[in-house]
Amino acid sequence: MYSVIKTAVVCGFESLPVKVETDVSDGMPSFDMVGFLTSEVKEARERVRTALKNAGFRLPAKKITINLTPADVRKSGTGCDLPMAASVLAAFGFLDEHILSNYLLLGEVGLNSSILPTKGVLSAAVLAQKEGMQGIVVPWENAREAAILDTVKVIPVKNLKEFVQICQQELPETCFYREQQEIWKTEYDVDFSELRGQPMLRRACEIAVSGMHNLLMMGPPGSGKTMAAKRIPTILPELSREEKLELSQIYSLCGLLEQERIIQNERPFRIPHNTVTAQALVGGGKQPHPGEISLAHHGILFLDELAEFKPGILDVLREPLEEKKVHISRVGGS
C-alpha cells in the first residue's frame, strides 16, 4: 500500500515543494522515516503515531516507511506533521489520497490529535499559487494568514478526526472568510508631523526619503534623533500589495505575524542593540533565518549609538549597502 501527499518546507525566504511518500508492507512492525530530516522532523514519528491512536485510528501492525522527497533538500520545522499523518491514513485506506492530490498540507500535530499552528504558512500559500494548486489545508489558527491570497482555497482544520471527515466528504467550495479591505489598511501609531522644531533635521529626513539616501544624525542625547527616525517610515510612499506580501512572507517565516494583523502593512522600523552579532544582523545559522537587515526590508534600519557597535559588525553592512541584497553561503546551499 502506497500513498503520496504534498507539503512544503522553508528554505531561506521561500517554501519548496516536498512530497510525503508512505509505504505500508508486511514484516516486523516498525515506523521508519528517511529523507534528510532534522531532529524536529524525526520526532514527528512519535507525535504522528500517538496522535493517530488518540484520534481513534487503530493501525494494523505493519512495516511503515515514510520518505520525504526530494532527498537533497533538508527538511526542518513541524509543518510536515499533518501531511505525514494524512499520508499514513491514506496508505491504510482511511481516506482517499486523490482528493488531496491538488492540495498542499501544512500543520503540526499534537499528541491529542489537534492541529497546531506553524510558521511559514503564507509562504506555503504563495507556493501553492505558483504551482497552480487548488488549495491548502492548514491549522485553524493559520487560516486568516493563508487566506490573504484570493486564488487559493483555504481549508482550516482543528484536529485529525475533523480532517478525515472533511476528506471523506466533498471538499468545501467556500474558503476561509476574507476581510480583504481591512487587512490591507495601513496605520501608523506615530506621524512625522509630531516632530516639532528641528527644521534642519526635518529637512535632512525629507531629502533622505526623497532620494532613498542613508542618513547620519549627530547630536546630544535627548535632541530628538530617535524620535525623528521612528517617524521617517510615515513619510515614505505606501507599500504596494506586492511589497506588503513579500514583507509578510519574511515575517511569517520568523513567526512575527500577529493573529490580529496578518499582513505587514507598515514599513518596518528595526532598531538592533549595539551588542548585536553579525549573524543576528545579516541572518544565517545552520538553518538560515532572516536577520535584522531582512526584517527591515522596505523600511528603516536604525543603528542607535553607532559608535558603540563593534567595527566588525559595521564591516558586515558593506555588502548589503553596496549590492542591496544579503547573500549567505552555507554547506547545504546559499
Residue ranges of model-derived segments:
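Peripheral, non-AAA+ core regions of ATP-driven protein-machinery
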Residues: 1-216, 220-227, 329
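Alpha-helical scaffold elements adjacent to nucleotide-binding pockets in ATP/GTP-utilizing enzyme cores
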Residues: 47, 51, 84, 123-127, ...
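Loop/turn-to-beta-strand initiation segments
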Residues: 134, 213, 297-300, 323-327
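P-loop NTPase nucleotide-binding/switch module
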Residues: 170-207, 211, 238-293
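Walker A/P-loop
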Residues: 216-261, 318, 323
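Conserved Walker
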Residues: 218-220, 286-293, 306, 323-334
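Conserved AAA+/SF3 P-loop NTPase catalytic/coupling segment centered on the Walker-B
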Residues: 273, 289-322
